[in-house]
Amino acid sequence: MPMWLQALMWGTLAGGALVLGAGIAWMWKVPPKIVSTVMAFGAGVLISALAFELVDEAVEGGGLLPTVLGFLLGALIFVGSNALLARAGAKHRKRSGGSQPSEKDSPGSGTAIAVGALIDGIPESVVLGVGLLAGGAVSPAMLAAVLISNVPEGLSSTAGMKKAGRSPAYVFGTWIGIAVFSGLAALLGYTALENAPETVIAFITAIAAGGILAMLADTMIPEAFEEHHNLTGLTAAVGFLSAFTIHHVGG
């Protein structure tokens, strides 16, 4: 299978985990504590993956300076975008409770939530495509991290959308659209950087890593703590060790 097609396939699969989570939340009422537990575990998995699969490899391939600058830029881009979207009604887009506004309460919030969810998922998909450049195959640890974190993201956000009165067409249109864009982002990450210097690849990888960490701190971890409370840290630690084990065995 051509590498570009693999990038498209893995990115779409990763985005498809959001659709799976959305389907579960729409069909069944999942207890909030279960959602929070899985989300805390997924946050730990992602932290491990971005540390060992992204930042560490970016430093080895392109050096410390491009990695540091890229990481800070990625965090700044996410935080800035998140602040703008929060003003438009997307502040609680990952919340499973009644925090999400309806379109009636906050006109334009539906679009903001959809754009926010897209911004959350794109960096993860880009690094799947970029990872193919380095190893010739998708990173098992990074793929597992994205899949494990995306299911509770889709589940929690959809539960909140449902309570806010969003229609099935809006909910599933949003997640299916993001799955498609995730595939395209992975494809772009591979094709655009196929012949790029190592420093550029390191810089782009670090941008994605910085965005992912900012997303975790601003959205996933607060949602996990809301219901899971004192066990959030322990559950995240188990997730971290699980991803590190996959990385160590796979490496």
List each model region and its residues.
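Intrinsically disordered, metal-sensing/regulatory segments
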Residues: 1-251
